[in-house]
């Protein structure tokens, strides 16, 4: 291995050290590599030079904890969308074990990485229903469209439920138009909890699932007065004692005032 630049620079300013090349190399090796450094850590730092040095020191065929480290490194690279790392690891270790690389690339919206891994997968990694659900829940429409076109199993109701919870109305609308799985009452309940007024409105007008009493309670607990008022008018629901208690605990006095006005009418 070449001597680290930092060690070489110090050696140049020391006549004694500079004359002892074997000592210089030993210092470089000691500084350069530690068993504390894993491939996954190198990948998380986006440092492919460090990754290569770790592999040289360990040896490509070192099995001491390396299988889990290799798979973890691949997953970290896929989750972060680091195509260079992904390609290097898959080409260096084509016979790796089963990983969640496809799912992590999809859920984080890295379509280029997802497509590459899917094309070069070793048969152990599969594109799961959860990958579709996570991609939808996180608002990655390009990934959702690609998975819709390239896999037959589709998604579950969690796709629309989670998209609604996170306020991704465009995903909810796309799933409604192109998929048959639909959603559950959790879609409106979660959207109300997070204060996504437009999502709640759209779901009530375009879907049949409706909501549960959790919707207005969650909206009230989180101080979303506009939603509380709208749900009361359009869904014929009222706040429970629990919602009042949570609103009071969190200082949402405007919610308590509104509830008081409703109770007086």
Curated annotation (Swiss-Prot):
Fetch the InterPro entries from UniProt. Answer: Ankyrin_rpt, Ankyrin_rpt-contain_sf, SecEffector_AnkRepeat
Tell me the compartments it is located in.
Secreted; Host nucleus; Host cytoplasm
Q: Which GO terms describe its cellular component?
A: extracellular region; host cell cytoplasm; host cell nucleus
The UniProt entry annotates ANK repeats at 34-64, 69-97, 98-126, 128-157, 159-183, 184-213, 215-240
Which domain of life does the UniProt lineage start with?
Answer: Eukaryota
Protein name listed in UniProt? Secreted RxLR effector protein 124
One Pfam entry name: Ank_2
Q: Gene encoding it?
A: RXLR124
Motif, RxLR-dEER: chain positions: 49-72
The record's comment about this protein's domains reads:
The RxLR-dEER motif acts to carry the protein into the host cell cytoplasm through binding to cell surface phosphatidylinositol-3-phosphate.
- Which SUPFAM superfamilies does the entry link to? Ankyrin repeat
Question: Which keywords are on file for this protein?
Answer: ANK repeat, Glycoprotein, Host cytoplasm, Host nucleus, Repeat, Secreted, Signal, Virulence
Q: Which family does it belong to?
A: Belongs to the RxLR effector family.
Signal sequence, renumbered to the chain: 1-14
Q: What does this protein do?
A: Secreted effector that partially suppresses the host cell death induced by cell death-inducing proteins.
Glycan-modified residues: 150, 236
* Keyword Repeat among record annotations: yes
